[in-house]
Regions:
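Membrane-proximal, proline-rich intrinsically disordered regions
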Residues: 21-70, 96, 288-289, 293
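Short, surface-exposed recognition loops and adjoining beta-strand edges that mediate ligand/DNA contacts
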Residues: 63-76, 194-212, 223-322
């Protein structure tokens, strides 16, 4: 009798456990809205597009790793030794954000692919807004692949989301195939609203942004394919004060052999003219940096960061330019440009006269006076001589 009761109890427990496991495997979203919960509406499409745009900030701008990986190893970047021990010394493997470019780009591609799948199936939004939403997601995918191919060469192409049936393990596509896909995406992205259309959302990309990026893609293909052409750059021994002219002979970048430089330079020129005719430059150089001019004038597409926010802020400005505190000292400003960069400009060039912070207070005080830092270092003589 005891055995019968025990077996009955065991059977009941097994059935209950199986039911519980099925319930556990059924995912329920409590603290976020899943794509399936959005529904079919203008608002649903907007949220899917916004979710993809969010990746630009959270994976590239807010961490700061995007600019570090693409700029730290240039000839003119400078800063403290602790900041240039890996990427700035040509050794990105030791950098904390080494994977951000790869992961961020493919996260953006995944979200854009998912958005394209969901929006394509919607029927309760206008044809115009549907086309615009799909074109924006194509633009974001193209931007991500353009980052990938320039930094890694051959990379996998995911034409649709993994959750929609795309195989997770994709082989690396050739450089030429990646560029062909980028061009295809940007040609579709030209279907976005223009910046002057009533449906355009400020802060989003427009068809002008698609044209501008396509022109940049063409010129990158052309320049990478060049061979045997002399290229003169400014540089030289760091002990030499004035930058020296150095001549290099261009060699075709691996993977760019099939591109015709003349053809793609011509395509870049023609596409760039379409952009030039649509946008205007600001009258004054410093207007470029005015907060009130964001997303206006010559700003074709901007990352929409939130000042002071650790998740959605722009750490690049904090780390490179710095932020003035109430006492006049500066927070951040860890990285900057070498004196050689400054000397590339004529002395009265507005870009360095007004566009460079030449003096800022340090944290120290000597004999009751504030100690200042100067850039470039000889600017201290100008101040002392009241020039």
């Amino acid at each position: 009798m005891k055995k019968i009761i025990f077996k009955s109890f065991l059977l009941l427990w097994t059935v209950l456990l199986a039911c519980s496991c099925n319930d556990l495997l059924d995912e329920k979203a409590y603290d976020f809205v899943s794509p399936e919960q959005l529904g079919d509406s203008e608002s649903a499409a907007s949220q899917l597009v916004t979710g993809a745009y969010n990746t630009v900030i959270t994976s590239f701008i807010a961490p700061g790793s995007y600019l570090y990986l693409t700029n730290m190893d240039c000839d003119y970047a400078s800063g403290a030794s602790w900041a240039f021990g890996n990427v700035g010394a040509g050794n990105p493997q030791g950098f904390w954000g080494i994977d951000h470019m790869w992961q961020g780009s493919y996260t953006l591609i995944h979200r854009a692919n998912l958005g394209i799948s969901k929006i394509s199936a919607m029927s309760n939004l206008s044809q115009e807004s549907k086309q615009d939403a799909l074109a924006q997601l194509c633009f974001l995918k193209a931007w991500a692949y353009f980052n990938l191919v320039r930094n890694y060469g051959p990379v996998p192409i995911f034409r649709k989301s993994i959750s929609e049936g795309e195989a997770m393990s994709q082989p690396r596509a050739s450089v030429s195939d990646v560029y062909a896909h980028i061009i295809e995406l940007l040609e579709q992205a030209e279907g976005m609203y223009s910046k002057d259309d009533a449906g355009f959302v400020v802060g989003h990309a427009s068809n002008g942004a698609a044209k501008a990026l396509l022109a940049k893609v063409y010129v990158t293909m052309a320049s990478g394919a060049m061979s045997g052409v002399p290229i003169v750059v400014k540089g030289g021994d760091p002990n030499i004060f004035e930058p020296q002219s150095i001549t290099h002979i261009a060699k075709t970048v691996a993977g760019y052999e099939s591109f015709d430089p003349a053809k793609y330079y011509a395509l870049a020129r023609d596409k760039a003219w379409e952009v030039i005719n649509e946008y205007t430059l600001f009258d004054n150089y410093m207007d470029v940096w005015a907060i009130g001019n964001r997303n206006k004038g010559e700003h074709i597409w901007m990352a929409q960061a939130i000042s002071g926010d650790k998740d959605y802020g722009n750490t690049i400005c904090h780390d490179y330019v710095g932020i003035f505190k109430e006492d006049g000292t500066m927070e951040g400003n860890w990285y900057g440009m070498r004196d050689h960069w400054y000397l590339l400009f004529e002395e009265q060039d507005t870009r360095i006269v007004d566009g460079v912070i030449h003096r800022y207070a340090s944290d120290g005080i000597s004999n009751g006076k504030v100690i200042y830092n100067y850039y470039p270092r000889w600017y201290a003589d100008k101040v002392e001589n009241k020039e």
